Amino acid sequence: RYSLWSAIGLSIAIAVGYENFHELLRGAEAMDNHFRTAPLEQNIPVIMALLGIWYNDYYNIHRYAVIPYDQYLKFLPAYLQQLDMESNGKSVRLDNRKITDYATGPALFGGAGTDVQHSFFQLLHQGTEPVPVDFIIPAVSHNEIGKHHEILLANVLAQAEALMKGKTPDEAAAELRAAGKD
């Protein structure tokens, strides 16, 4: 999980080009600096960690989805799955005592939004248990095709709003009646 920062990074630099690899390192350094210097209420890694603990321990939610709406990020959920679940998938403390008083981490899943929104989104929208979701979309597309990115952004925002607000059965029935589909 940390090997890209070591000598193995050479193979990555060769594959993506030194300038791209250097840009990755600059981004990592910027995030490290943000983590070290940002006030807690603005510290993105701290806020994300606290949300994870809150969902896991307070709400007893033991699953989490990462949905990038960009094909260049389609492997990000698998990478995060390995990083997070391997790190947190422990049942024994450093002193060899069994962990019994808290869950060590959620099951993480996901995939590229356009690929997975017709597979497990039914569970996200209508399942009986909540699933925290992080939607990711770049501000600017690397492959701008007409209005495709604008449409994709609208889709992501609509998915997020639907999950955030939802509808009661009465609201859904009223919408169907208003559309003449009762």
Predicted segments, located by residue:
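Active-site phosphate/pyrophosphate-binding segments
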Residues: 1-146, 166
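Acidic, Ser/Thr-rich peripheral helices and adjacent loops at domain boundaries
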Residues: 144-181
